[in-house]
Amino acid sequence: MPFINALGYDVFNPLEVLPEMTCDIGTKKGEKIDYAIMKDDQPILLIECKHWKQDLNLHDNQLLRYFNVSKAKFGLLTNGIIYRFYTDLKEPNIMDDKPFLEVDITDLRDNQIEELKKFHKSYFDVDNDFSSASELKYM
C-alpha cells in the first residue's frame, strides 16, 4: 500500500483503491485481485501483490486471468521490490506475456522514475500511458 499511496491514491477510499476486487473467471467465481485503482467507477490498473521472496515469474498467469476479464488497461505484478507493468499491446483485452516496464526499487533509474510518474493520480491518462507503453515495449 505504500507504493499505491506514493502514486497519490487514497488507499482508504474505495472509490480510488478497491481492495480484493472480484474478477469472476469463467466458472471460477469469487476470484479476487489484490487492488484495483479506480476512476469513474471503472478499474484502470489492477495490482497483484506477492511476498517479497516470491518469484514473480510464477504468478504472471494469475494477473493475466484477472486482466483478461476486466476493463482495466494496465496490470501491475509486484513483490514489493520488483514492479512489472503490463498492458494489452499485442491484442486488445488480452494481457501481453511480457511487461512493458519493470522496475527494481533497489536500483531505480531516472528514466524509470519518469515512467512511474505517469501512473501518479495527478498524471494518469489511460490513452497517453498506453502510447508510452507501446514506445517502451518496442524500444
Where are these regions (language model features)?
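A short, conserved, highly charged catalytic patch centered on acidic carboxylates
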Residues: 1-74, 85-139
